[in-house]
């Protein structure tokens, strides 16, 4: 017979004081700040969202168009492939085209195998880029590796450019990996093969950074990354990398995949590391659907940072998931309409309404959580659920403001959102909703 539950013990647990510390991430890992163009990375600067084009870099107009789209979506740095002479020759024209559009987004050159040759033979390319990405696993092989690595570093020093030393387990330095595997096999207590591979990743990045410093590249010109495609391995690699250095760190899960799988994998890995204070810049490496929108990776990166409370980029739209009480699609359609409307308007709103990115909007589907959740938002609406009175109360800054009825609820609510933004964040902002005059119901 099982013992009776101790009611007094249970009550004592309930009466224990709640945590009085503020919920939030661990303190940021202290890193050396690096300037990439006019964007600060590390050293306590806001975590930067970056992206990469998938155009043929030799296609100047196509690459300009995609960089502009990524930048306008919120990418704060954009990386392009520089894989051959035609691409290197195109880089200055791409930079000029972007600047003519009024965009100052830093452009990063991604180099593999022949970066030393391209940068030396196309000095205008070396000058036009804001940062060079070097992969220590393929910068050169055998006796050429150190020389070709040094060539790129010296060009970076000459042009006062930042460098990312980016190890990737798909192109890991095989000499280093073989050396560590042999040492591990001879050990009395050999480690798991994956653990040795992770160690090779970290060593590849750190040894390359140390070599770059010996050549003369200062720490405030270097960013490190060590990307793998498995979530748990990525977390372990970056934890180790952060514990052993104070270089600025770029986070990314390589080959994350398509659609929801790629979003979930990247968010799971990067979310844990960011919560631990690790990471100065991020990229969500999504495989786009054929003909899909490349800016999706920027949006996901922003949403990850915003939902975790690190930064604000666009107003948040809270919406309930729906249940049997919400058999119509009205609230879903309104939530999508408001969210799309906000994203479409943000390029203009950023300059016109400073601070609008902090706005919270709620679109709820029934009476259960609708009014309460709407009160927590700056402006929220509680639509009627199945069998409820066909009326939608609107709450502004915690107070009931108006009840909408009829067939134009969506348009009426959107108009109220615009009115709120103009009054709260416009040229002569007002402190609260008291300035908005509610209409008679």
Curated annotation (Swiss-Prot):
Keyword annotations from UniProtKB, A to Z: 4Fe-4S, Iron, Iron-sulfur, Isoprene biosynthesis, Metal-binding, Oxidoreductase
Cofactor note: Binds 1 [4Fe-4S] cluster.
UniProt pathway: Isoprenoid biosynthesis; isopentenyl diphosphate biosynthesis via DXP pathway; isopentenyl diphosphate from 1-deoxy-D-xylulose 5-phosphate: step 5/6
Matching Pfam families: GcpE
Reaction equation(s) it catalyzes: (2E)-4-hydroxy-3-methylbut-2-enyl diphosphate + oxidized [flavodoxin] + H2O + 2 H(+) = 2-C-methyl-D-erythritol 2,4-cyclic diphosphate + reduced [flavodoxin]
Stated role: Converts 2C-methyl-D-erythritol 2,4-cyclodiphosphate (ME-2,4cPP) into 1-hydroxy-2-methyl-2-(E)-butenyl 4-diphosphate.
Protein name as it appears in the record: 4-hydroxy-3-methylbut-2-en-1-yl diphosphate synthase (flavodoxin)
Native source organism of the sequence: Rhodopseudomonas palustris (strain ATCC BAA-98 / CGA009)
């Amino acid at each position: 017979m099982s013992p009776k539950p101790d009611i007094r013990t249970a009550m004592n647990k309930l009466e224990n004081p709640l945590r009085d510390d503020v919920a939030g991430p661990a303190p940021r890992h202290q890193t050396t700040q690096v300037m990439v163009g006019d964007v600060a990375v590390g050293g306590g600067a806001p975590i930067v969202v970056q992206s990469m084009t998938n155009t043929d870099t030799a296609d100047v107009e196509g690459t300009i168009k995609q960089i502009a789209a990524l930048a306008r979506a919120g990418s704060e740095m954009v990386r392009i492939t520089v894989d051959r002479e035609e691409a290197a020759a195109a880089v200055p024209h791409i930079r000029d085209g972007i600047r003519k559009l009024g965009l100052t987004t830093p452009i990063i050159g991604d180099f593999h195998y022949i970066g030393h040759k391209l940068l030396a033979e196309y000095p205008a390319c070396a000058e036009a880029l804001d940062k060079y990405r070097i992969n220590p696993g393929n910068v050169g092989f055998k006796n050429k590796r150190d020389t070709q690595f040094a060539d790129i570093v010296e060009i970076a020093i000459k042009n006062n450019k930042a460098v990312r030393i980016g190890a990737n387990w798909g192109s890991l330095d095989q000499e280093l990996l073989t050396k560590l595997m042999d040492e591990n096999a001879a050990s009395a207590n050999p480690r798991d093969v994956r653990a040795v591979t992770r160690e090779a990743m970290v060593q590849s990045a750190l040894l390359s950074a140390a070599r770059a410093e010996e050549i003369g590249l200062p720490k405030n010109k270097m960013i490190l990354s060590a990307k793998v495609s498995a979530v748990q391995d990525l977390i372990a690699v970056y934890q180790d990398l952060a514990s052993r250095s104070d270089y600025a760190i770029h986070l990314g899960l390589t080959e994350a995949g398509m659609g929801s799988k790629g979003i979930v994998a990247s968010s799971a890995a990067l979310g844990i590391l960011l919560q631990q204070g690790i990471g100065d810049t991020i990229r969500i490496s999504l495989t786009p659907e054929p003909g899909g929108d490349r800016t999706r990776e920027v949006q996901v990166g922003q949403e990850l940072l915003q939902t975790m409370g690190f930064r604000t980029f666009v107003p948040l739209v809270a919406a309930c998931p729906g249940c049997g009480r919400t058999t119509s699609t009205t609230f879903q359609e309104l939530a999508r309409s408001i969210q799309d409307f906000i994203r479409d308007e943000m390029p203009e709103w950023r300059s016109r309404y400073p601070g609008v990115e902090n706005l919270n909007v709620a679109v709820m589907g029934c009476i259960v959580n609708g009014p309460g959740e709407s009160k927590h938002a700056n402006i929220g609406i509680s639509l009627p659920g199945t069998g409820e009175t066909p009326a939608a109360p609107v709450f502004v800054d915690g107070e009931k403001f108006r009840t909408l009825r009829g067939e134009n609820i969506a348009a009426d609510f959107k108009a109220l959102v615009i009115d709120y933004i103009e009054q709260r964040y416009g040229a002569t902002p007002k402190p609260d909703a008291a300035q908005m005059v509610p209409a008679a119901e």
